[in-house]
């Protein structure tokens, strides 16, 4: 294999290792819960990486982040395992 091919292979392996979460859960599960910046009261759930459990919180209806789920089952399937 040529040195260019080896460099390409090494680059692809590095990229794959960087983008593949170690635990198998999406990286957004590690985000802190964010209620957002509007004024609605939407019952939601977020994953707590320190306790490895899902908890309820109130979402404001806009903004926030991807660590937000409509049901505790969806949170558990996505982030707990």
Curated annotation (Swiss-Prot):
<keyword id="KW-0722">Serine protease inhibitor</keyword>
<dbReference type="GO" id="GO:0005576">
    <property type="term" value="C:extracellular region"/>
</dbReference>
<dbReference type="Pfam" id="PF00014">
    <property type="entry name" value="Kunitz_BPTI"/>
</dbReference>
<feature type="domain" description="BPTI/Kunitz inhibitor">
    <location>
        <begin position="29"/>
        <end position="79"/>
    </location>
</feature>
<keyword id="KW-0325">Glycoprotein</keyword>
<feature type="disulfide bond">
    <location>
        <begin position="29"/>
        <end position="79"/>
    </location>
</feature>
<keyword id="KW-0964">Secreted</keyword>
<dbReference type="GO" id="GO:0004867">
    <property type="term" value="F:serine-type endopeptidase inhibitor activity"/>
</dbReference>
<comment type="function">
    <text>Serine protease inhibitor that inhibits chymotrypsin (Ki=25 nM). Also interacts with vasopressin V2 receptor (V2R/AVPR2). Inhibits vasopressin binding human V2R in the nanomolar range (Ki=112 nM), and also moderately inhibits vasopressin-induced cAMP production (IC(50)=138 nM). In vivo, intraperitoneal injection of this protein into rats increases diuresis by 2.2-fold, without any loss of electrolytes.</text>
</comment>
<keyword id="KW-1015">Disulfide bond</keyword>
<feature type="disulfide bond">
    <location>
        <begin position="38"/>
        <end position="62"/>
    </location>
</feature>
<feature type="signal peptide">
    <location>
        <begin position="1"/>
        <end position="24"/>
    </location>
</feature>
<feature type="site" description="Reactive bond for chymotrypsin">
    <location>
        <begin position="39"/>
        <end position="40"/>
    </location>
</feature>
<dbReference type="InterPro" id="IPR036880">
    <property type="entry name" value="Kunitz_BPTI_sf"/>
</dbReference>
<dbReference type="InterPro" id="IPR050098">
    <property type="entry name" value="TFPI/VKTCI-like"/>
</dbReference>
<feature type="glycosylation site" description="N-linked (GlcNAc...) asparagine">
    <location>
        <position position="76"/>
    </location>
</feature>
<comment type="similarity">
    <text>Belongs to the venom Kunitz-type family.</text>
</comment>
<protein>
    <recommendedName>
        <fullName>Kunitz-type serine protease inhibitor NACI</fullName>
    </recommendedName>
</protein>
<feature type="disulfide bond">
    <location>
        <begin position="54"/>
        <end position="75"/>
    </location>
</feature>
<dbReference type="InterPro" id="IPR002223">
    <property type="entry name" value="Kunitz_BPTI"/>
</dbReference>
<dbReference type="GO" id="GO:0090729">
    <property type="term" value="F:toxin activity"/>
</dbReference>
<dbReference type="InterPro" id="IPR020901">
    <property type="entry name" value="Prtase_inh_Kunz-CS"/>
</dbReference>
<keyword id="KW-1213">G-protein coupled receptor impairing toxin</keyword>
<keyword id="KW-0800">Toxin</keyword>
<keyword id="KW-0646">Protease inhibitor</keyword>
<keyword id="KW-0732">Signal</keyword>
